[in-house]
Amino acid sequence: YLDRIASPPVPTICSGITVGVRMGDVRTRAECRADLRREAQRYWQGFRNSLTETGYLSLTVWVDVAFSSLTYNIGIGAVSGSTAVRRLNAGDVRGACEALTWWTRAGVRARILFPRRQREHAICIRGLP
């Protein structure tokens, strides 16, 4: 399918895979799962590489999950330079989780992104004091 939220629109397959995808490509369910595992690992590692020691030590499993989801959705470069990561690297975990909710635009305000960010925020703050 053509992801029309992206600018410019980008051919996409499975659960948001875009690298090397051409319109008309077909994948099996097993191939999609394998692609998702590989891409999720790549995005998770990209997020982790943007952390300072303070940011890394501030992680809970829930913060890690929320930021990995955000990174998969908006990209490693966008997350790495974000206020959310800057706050996390400063040890401001709650502020970092709040900043996740700011990513609701994809060229224009995208209604589908608001509930996603709310879910990521709820995951991110789970267990925080």
What are these regions (language model features)?
Residues 1-6, 16:
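Core of compact, soluble alpha-helical bundle domains
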Residues 5-8, 21, 26-38, 44, ...:
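Long, amphipathic alpha-helical surface segments
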Residues 8-10, 62:
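Extracytoplasmic
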Residues 10-13, 17-20:
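A short, structured beta-strand/loop element
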Residues 13, 67-68, 96, 120:
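Residue-level detector of buried hydrophobic side-chain packing
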Residues 58-67, 94-98:
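Alpha-helical scaffolds flanking conserved acidic
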